[in-house]
């Protein structure tokens, strides 16, 4: 995950003796906010991920803004950032910065997994000459299952943006660095 823009921006704020809260919203590798906080102890840095889909960011911000995660060790920073977000988020959650960073990855890879699962079922249905659309539309009648990320067609398959492949690759590399024997994230990339 390339964090150079975030690091450069925070370095500039530090050089200019910035005194406010720095809320990082860009997806960064888990541990980045903690590292930057240690590097710039005079800045109050927190991680506040956005959960916007590329194709409908405005609608997500206004209508589907159901969660605001604030990654900070400071109660005061949490309070101020929460207040700054006003009434849009339905839920607020204070976590450690690294936990908040991981929530963002979990969200995106969860969505990538749904795409992979849907494309696989689409292929099975196509081979069996049955309607994926009818099956999917029946499934989403269950209250806990959303229609998001379940659309499939012959013209375009796999990821439809830059965030999901980028974040899945970043977690696959993190798993490698941690010497974990988990192929799941690489499988998602291979399938998309």
Go through each PLM region and give its residues:
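Internal alpha-helical scaffold of NAD(P)-dependent oxidoreductase catalytic cores
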Residues: 35-48, 53-148, 174-181
């Amino acid at each position: 995950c390339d964090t150079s823009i975030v690091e450069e921006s925070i370095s500039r704020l530090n050089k200019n003796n910035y005194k406010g809260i720095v809320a990082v919203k860009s997806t960064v590798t888990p541990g980045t906010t903690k590292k930057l906080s240690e590097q710039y102890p005079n800045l109050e840095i927190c991680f506040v991920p956005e959960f916007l889909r590329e194709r409908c960011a405005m609608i997500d911000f206004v209508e589907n803004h159901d969660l605001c995660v604030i990654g900070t060790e400071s109660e005061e920073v949490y309070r101020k950032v929460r207040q700054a977000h006003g009434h849009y988020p339905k839920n607020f959650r204070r976590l450690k910065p690294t936990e908040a960073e991981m929530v963002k990855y979990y969200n995106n890879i969860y969505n990538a997994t749904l795409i992979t699962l849907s494309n696989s079922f689409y292929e099975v249905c196509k081979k069996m000459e049955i309607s994926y659309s009818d099956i999917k539309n029946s499934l989403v009648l269950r209250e806990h299952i959303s229609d998001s990320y379940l659309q499939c067609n012959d013209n375009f398959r796999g990821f439809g943006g830059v965030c999901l492949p980028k974040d899945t690759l970043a977690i696959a590399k993190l798993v490698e660095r941690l010497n974990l024997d988990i192929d799941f994230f690489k499988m998602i990339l291979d399938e998309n």
